């Protein structure tokens, strides 16, 4: 069993940011940002997310920290910034992240904290019954979006 500080459950997204006539591509999603902050603060964080072969995640994340469910099309948001306002739309919606698809990996980790942070309600409810000894927190945005 591997002990980790934080397990973040929610999809990493690809964000297309349009400012004027320029497009900028980046990763996003609460799981990704939690990873970046945890890394800076020295915490060991694992991420559960859907991933596709269309993004080279290794450029941005220590791939050993990623517990993934394969998908054809990852979650994509387009953010168009006009006159200081953001107009957001979903280009690719996520599928459900399913416990049964990850059960071997889930059985081998013991997180101190589980951070439920979906983007568009993609976390299967069975995840809430796992990790009995962990402190659990939620980012509600992705549950109500």
Model-derived regions: residue spans:
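Histidine-anchored nucleotide/phosphate-binding helix
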Residues: 29-40
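Short, catalytically relevant binding-site loops at active-site mouths
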Residues: 121-122, 143-145
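Short, acidic/turn-prone active-site loops that include or flank metal/cofactor-
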Residues: 30-31, 71-72, 140-143
């Amino acid at each position: 069993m591997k002990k980790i500080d934080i397990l973040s459950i929610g999809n990493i997204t690809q964000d297309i940011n349009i400012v004027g006539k320029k497009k900028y591509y980046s990763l996003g999603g609460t799981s990704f940002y939690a990873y970046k902050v945890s890394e800076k603060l020295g915490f060991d964080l694992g991420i559960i997310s859907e991933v596709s072969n269309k993004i080279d995640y290794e450029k941005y994340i220590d791939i050993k920290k990623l517990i993934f469910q394969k998908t054809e099309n990852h979650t994509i948001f387009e953010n168009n910034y006009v006159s200081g306002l953001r107009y957001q739309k979903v280009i690719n919606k996520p599928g459900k992240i399913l416990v049964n698809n990850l059960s071997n990996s889930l059985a081998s980790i013991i997180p101190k904290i589980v951070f439920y942070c979906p983007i568009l309600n993609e976390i299967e409810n069975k995840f809430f019954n796992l990790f009995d000894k962990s402190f659990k927190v939620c980012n509600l945005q992705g549950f109500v979006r």
